[in-house]
């Protein structure tokens, strides 16, 4: 089941008195624990989130996209609203984070990415045109910029300190209902979801109700601090069934800072191009027949990634087209998601051990990771 997308930089930074990062490093102010509505000294089963909601809601916006489309019997394309989601103001000068699938554009023949027109509706109802600074399909995040006064940036929390069972609050605009709050608990802090080509690595799972339109909204702790960006729900019906997911704010910080500075998120890459459609299917008879016709042998592995081409750091390593990637840093690689899990915490320049199959032999090499030149 496809979770992501199933629901729904220009140089604006002044050189004067601007921090390098949108997300400042430091310890955020803690306003204290949410008030228990049960006077019993034992752990209370419910909490009062009124203060948390008051702090977070003004920073959550509605995000509407408009595309030019031509209807039946129409000679010309007209602009229509084609999708909606939520977003979170993370900087008082107009930086908003939302989901990639909410505002994703398309790539032209010359490689230029074209984005739809995006309009943001603020907490007070004001509508403002937004510019897409950049998107990151790997994390399902996108960054917008708006020009407006008196914006309230949400306070940032720390997703690395989250614990299972901790109370959280989802804020967004589900099903067209603006400024909606739902409450639940953290069900898992490092949930891996191998969906789509990239998958969700170490996401936050919660039972707080997340419905269509919540995508890109805020997941907050009991103090109203941002701990995650709501991404999707695992439901075949498209309605909340108590399983929602969010991208940890610690990851969002890096992605947003990269997009604002460079126009894209920076990732380390191994420099191999593989046939994604064959990933996880090397034991399939038709897949094996196809590969055998290309490499002219049939004794290749039944697991791993079939390498179509090499570039960057893998050039000269001994790895060639027709080889199979077996392990990275001791972790078996059978799908693109397996590879993403291993590479995500790595940095550009890190040296990693790679085990691969070449012409009937298993070999190992150390490769220094380089920066990805693409946005996927």
Labelled PLM ranges:
Residues 1-25, 117, 221-222, 226, ...:
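C-terminal recognition in membrane/secretory proteostasis and scaffolding
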Residues 8, 80, 102-110, 151, ...:
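Active-site loop architecture of trypsin-fold serine endopeptidases
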Residues 9-74, 86, 92, 163, ...:
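N-terminal activation segment of mature serine protease catalytic domains
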Residues 41-51, 70-95, 127-129, 153-155, ...:
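A conserved glycine-rich beta-strand in the N-terminal activation segment of trypsin-fold
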Residues 58-64, 87, 94, 98, ...:
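Terminal peptide-recognition signature
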Residues 63-67, 122-124, 134-136, 145-148, ...:
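Flexible glycine-/small-residue-rich
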Residues 69-80, 108-111, 123, 133-139, ...:
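Gly/Ser-enriched beta-turn/beta-hairpin loop segments
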Residues 84, 91-179, 327, 332-337, ...:
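Conserved active-site neighborhood of the chymotrypsin/trypsin-like protease fold
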């Amino acid at each position: 089941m496809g979770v992501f997308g199933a629901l729904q930089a220009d140089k604006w930074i002044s050189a004067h008195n601007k921090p390098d990062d949108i997300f400042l490093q430091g310890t955020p102010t803690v306003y204290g624990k949410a008030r228990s509505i049960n006077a019993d000294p034992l752990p209370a089963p419910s909490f009062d989130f009124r203060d948390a909601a008051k702090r977070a809601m003004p920073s959550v916006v509605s995000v509407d996209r408009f595309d030019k489309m031509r209807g039946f019997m129409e000679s010309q394309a007209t602009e229509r609203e084609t999708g909606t989601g939520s977003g979170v103001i993370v900087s008082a000068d107009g930086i908003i984070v939302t989901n990639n699938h909410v505002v994703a554009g398309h790539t032209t023949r010359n490689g230029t990415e074209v984005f739809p027109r995006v309009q943001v509706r603020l907490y007070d109802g004001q509508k403002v045109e937004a510019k897409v600074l950049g998107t990151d399909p790997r994390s399902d995040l996108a960054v917008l910029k708006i020009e407006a006064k008196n914006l309230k940036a949400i306070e940032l929390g720390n997703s690395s300190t989250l614990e299972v069972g901790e109370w959280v609050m989802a804020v967004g605009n589900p099903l067209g209902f603006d400024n909606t709050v739902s409450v639940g608990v953290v069900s898992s802090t490092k949930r891996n979801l191998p969906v789509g080509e990239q998958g969700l690595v170490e996401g936050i799972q919660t039972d707080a109700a997340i419905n269509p339109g919540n995508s890109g909204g805020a997941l907050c702790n009991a103090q109203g601090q941002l701990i995650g960006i709501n991404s999707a729900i695992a439901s075949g019906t498209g309605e909340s069934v108590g399983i929602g997911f969010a991208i940890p704010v610690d990851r969002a910080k890096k992605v947003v800072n990269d997009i604002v500075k460079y126009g894209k998120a920076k990732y380390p890459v191994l420099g191999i191009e593989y046939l994604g459609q064959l990933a996880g299917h090397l034991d399939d008879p038709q897949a094996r027949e196809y590969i055998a016709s290309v490499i002219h042998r049939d004794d290749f592995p039944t697991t791993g990634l079939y390498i179509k081409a090499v570039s960057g750091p893998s050039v000269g390593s001994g790895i060639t087209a027709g080889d199979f990637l077996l392990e990275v840093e001791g972790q078996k690689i059978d799908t693109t998601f397996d590879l993403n899990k291993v590479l995500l915490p790595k940095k550009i320049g890190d040296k990693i051990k790679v085990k691969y199959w070449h012409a009937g032999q298993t070999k190992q090499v150390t490769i220094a990771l380089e920066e990805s030149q693409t946005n996927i």
